[in-house]
Swiss-Prot record:
Organism of provenance: Pseudomonas paraeruginosa (strain DSM 24068 / PA7)
One protein family per Pfam: SlyX
Gene: slyX
InterPro entries: SlyX
Protein name, entry field: Protein SlyX homolog
Coiled-coil boundaries: none
Length: 69
């Protein structure tokens, strides 16, 4: 009887662990989708920033600082 009770307990725990594992997997998949979407948005923003800097003549690193008064 004790062995049967222990087996039932283990089966119950495994079922809960399977459910938890599935839920965690779904969260990881959704997070990966969010990361990929954010990476695309960041790349688009970088491109827009580079385009705007090109239009306004962006700051050149070799440009001398203005004289102080």
């Amino acid at each position: 009887m004790e062995l049967e009770s222990r087996m039932d307990d283990l089966e119950c725990r495994q079922a809960f662990q399977d459910d938890t594992l599935q839920a965690l997997n779904e969260v990881v998949v959704e997070q990966q989708r969010s990361i990929e979407r954010l990476q695309l948005q960041v790349a688009a923003l970088i491109k827009r920033l580079e385009d705007v800097q090109g239009l306004v003549g962006g700051v050149e690193e070799d440009e001398a600082p203005p004289p102080h008064y």
